[in-house]
């Protein structure tokens, strides 16, 4: 019997029958194939209004997935993602063999099991309009790489995952979301830059509580001699509790980029654009289903929630000097100053007429910054490359600030 599915896997329910007439020439699927194949679909539409009343509407992601089980221990999963309606890519695609609950194997394009945003990427899995910044800028969701992995359950409620993956591409690192542009997304296989990732979690001890944590470590040279010695590490811990109307969660993530000055030298990134050596994010959030107050027996939910987040993707910079030295427009040596941290408060309502549909409204307020002031603008000559542009949703998230958000999310 296969082990229980982990949150990073997409296992949508069986498709609803009769939404559209069948094509006349099409043949129905054999009964055995239909029973073993599930087709899923999830996505989200968002509207944001900032403090200056500027409005931004977007479709951050639409995902279609197929989950097929040829037999009781073999599984094939593929998910196709349209990102901001501008990029079509595989979100995950793997072959899984699970001969026993204690051990299973996967190979293909795997989701890295770090952060709640990667463990449960569906927009119906979180209450806020968009993911917390920690899950966008520190442990960037949805983070996927080519590789092989093992998973299983050992003992009551103790689950594990381990992966050997293709490494990150250091030329895609940035100041605002350090690792986001370095993800391979299955587009390349950097064998020389192999990385490892893993996760342990305790499930339902007590019922409704999931506590876990994990880590990632790997090279990010992408075969470039200029990046020799560039290493990346991420550590993360999280907790979730959902029972009796309560929806509570917390997460902490910290990233390390060893010798990040190598990227800054190669790309000519200076001052506020320089890639950091450390960054972190932490948030806590709590919600309660108001429909539970009256003791109503209904599948609907009306969750009021509030949360706090503190984040700094550039909490520490490399102490090595640039080569050649970077200078300010005034002719001074360029400091490698970290950025101040951001503190955000979010609150709102998440209404679910059914578990697969969510209508969300929230407000995000930036309540202050702490730490060093932003570094002055820098200039440098002869930069050999340019950093990879951030996605629209990640770039908007990195700016932070006060805003109101509305969303319709679904997962079938």
Please identify what each model-predicted range represents.
Residues 136, 183-187, 272:
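Active-site rim elements
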Residues 54, 137-141, 188-191, 227-229, ...:
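Short Gly/Pro-enriched turn/cap motifs at secondary-structure boundaries
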Residues 124-132, 178-181, 265-268, 323-329:
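Short glycine/proline- and charge-enriched loop/turn segments
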Residues 166-178, 188:
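Charge-patterned, long linear interaction tracts outside catalytic cores
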Residues 1-48, 160, 322-325, 330-332, ...:
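N-terminal periplasmic/intermembrane-space "pro-region" immediately following the signal or transit peptide
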Residues 49-51, 96-98, 118, 208-412:
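Outer-membrane beta-barrel pore domains
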Residues 27-170, 192-210, 283-294, 299, ...:
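Outer membrane beta-barrel
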Residues 178-226, 230:
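Loop-centered beta-sheet repeat module
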């Amino acid at each position: 019997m296969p082990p229980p599915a982990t949150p990073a896997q997409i296992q949508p329910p069986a498709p609803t029958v009769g939404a559209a007439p069948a094509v006349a020439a099409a043949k129905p699927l054999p009964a055995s194939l239909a029973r073993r194949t599930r087709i899923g679909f999830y996505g989200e539409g968002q509207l944001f209004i900032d403090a200056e009343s500027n409005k931004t509407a977007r479709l951050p992601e639409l995902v279609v997935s197929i989950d097929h089980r040829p037999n009781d221990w073999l599984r094939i999963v593929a998910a196709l993602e349209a990102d901001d309606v501008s990029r079509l890519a595989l979100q995950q695609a793997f072959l899984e063999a699970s001969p026993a609950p204690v051990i299973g194997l996967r190979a293909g394009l795997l989701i890295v099991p770090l952060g709640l945003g990667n463990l449960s990427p569906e927009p119906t899995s979180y209450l806020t309009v968009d993911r917390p910044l920690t899950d966008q800028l520190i442990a960037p969701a949805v983070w996927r790489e080519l590789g092989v992995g093992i998973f299983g359950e050992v003992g009551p409620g103790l689950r594990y995952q381990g992966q050997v993956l293709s490494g990150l591409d250091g030329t895609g690192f940035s100041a605002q979301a350090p690792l986001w542009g370095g993800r391979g997304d299955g587009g390349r296989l950097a064998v020389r830059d192999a990385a490892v990732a893993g996760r342990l979690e305790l499930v339902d001890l007590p019922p409704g509580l999931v506590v876990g944590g994990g880590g990632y470590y790997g090279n990010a040279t992408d075969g470039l001699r200029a990046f020799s010695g560039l290493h990346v590490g991420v550590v993360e811990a999280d907790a979730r509790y959902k029972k009796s109307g309560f929806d509570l969660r917390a997460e902490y993530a910290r990233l390390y980029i060893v010798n990040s000055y190598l990227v800054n030298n190669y790309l000519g990134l200076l001052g506020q654009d320089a890639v950091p050596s450390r960054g972190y994010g932490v948030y806590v959030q709590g919600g309660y289903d108001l429909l539970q107050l009256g003791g109503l027996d209904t599948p609907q939910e009306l969750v009021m929630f509030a949360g706090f987040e503190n984040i700094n993707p550039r909490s520490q910079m490399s102490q090595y000097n640039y080569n050649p030295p970077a200078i300010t427009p005034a002719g001074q040596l360029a400091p490698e100053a970290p950025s101040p941290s951001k503190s955000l408060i979010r609150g709102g309502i998440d209404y679910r007429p059914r578990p697969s549909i969510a209508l969300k409204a929230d407000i995000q307020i930036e309540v202050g910054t702490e730490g060093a002031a932003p570094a002055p603008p820098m200039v440098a000559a002869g930069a050999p490359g340019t950093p990879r542009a951030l996605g629209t949703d990640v770039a908007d998230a990195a700016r932070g600030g006060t805003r109101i958000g509305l969303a319709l999310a679904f997962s079938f």
